């Protein structure tokens, strides 16, 4: 189905109407070297899970188990970027993107997670990187974005074993050697403070192990030790530090790139204005954000975690502390929403400890029956644009103003089977969301925060993990029924005009800064 001329006329006037109702913002509000891009991951985009020598990942296995994914779907095809990357790069170039953040599939490079290299995988990523650069787009490469080679999970338990530290370092070095002459931005691991509790506390992500009470009933292994999430996280941190050390010792001076870690970073507000609730905010920040950032800045875990967890939190020797400390050139921040935090036990099912039960903090999106922000198509994600400024300025103050890249930010809409294509394309709420977030981010930069980039999640609608294809974040609509055809949404129009300094791409933000 093609988008009609009438549809574009309607979208154009919708955008004009949006402008009239909403201080002016365009790319000129940001530093001249500020990097705008979109973000993706291998499992969510590539497809081709059994082609050209790729080995299975833990996500390949999980999605073929009944009841794991909301719509019983999988990433076997996803958006088929493995075959359609040139088409997608043309879309990126048409938008005027500076960079494209994608991840490398570990099991496409090393089908068994270690050992023999799959040269077809090397060739694919070489072709992708070269095509991006030929179109003026910088590759921003993540080494691990949730999809662990299944062979490593089966062999020794994946992130629960210290063996993974050397295997990750070896895999990272293969990538530095093969692609580093052209890749100037590396991320070691994406959102360990999310995939670790999802995989080892509540059992929704691989390897579906449950350490928390009332966790996922489909856990492969229930009643696991409550120390497991912290052990897995410890090995993630040491693997990260080992990869950074290898990059700095052998490649960084020659290749001239930078390397960092990407963290999930919601902001939190106290449910009530009381010392107890403000303490709850500090505590959830310790158990979420600071769990991974304190070690790479200060060389140890937050004191709050040490006091509450005792021997369940691994010790860090002075040697390991020195290796961890300063193991980043930038911090990647993935920010989507803001929630209320409270120490009060739940009175309604909306309150939850969920991923961080040891914090004894309950999170909610409501106070006295009023949402913290507009609801979105995904439960737990609310529109609170000022949160991006607050989390950035918190990181600035707490960690002495490190370089920050907003590695993901996006607006989810639910897939409604009754929605027409035209309704799906008219995503005015997504435009307002990004416009307002960028206004607050611009304010944070003006206040002195060293933010260098902003990546929209995502270029395309894609496979959204346990939600399957029921949630859409893309600037482009993807028809998953009819050959993954891409259709530009109104937000793609707006982002193109915003990036190309077109006056019609300027928006008026409802924010008051």
Curated annotation (Swiss-Prot):
Glycans are attached at residues 223, 447. Residues 1-23 form the signal peptide. GO terms for biological process: carbohydrate metabolic process; lignin biosynthetic process. A beta-D-glucoside binds at residues 44, 145, 190-191, 336, 408, 457, 464-465, 473. Disulfide bonds join 210-219. The active site is at 191 (proton donor), 408 (nucleophile). Homodimer. It catalyses: 4-O-(beta-D-glucosyl)-(E)-coniferol + H2O = (E)-coniferol + D-glucose. Glycosylated. It holds the Pfam family Glyco_hydro_1. Its EC number is 3.2.1.126. It comes from the Eukaryota. The keyword Cell wall biogenesis/degradation does not apply. Optimum pH is 5.4-5.9. InterPro entries: Glyco_hydro_1, Glyco_hydro_1_N_CS, Glycoside_hydrolase_SF. This is Coniferin beta-glucosidase. Inhibited by glucono-1,5-lactone, but not by bromoconduritol or conduritol B epoxide. Belongs to the glycosyl hydrolase 1 family.
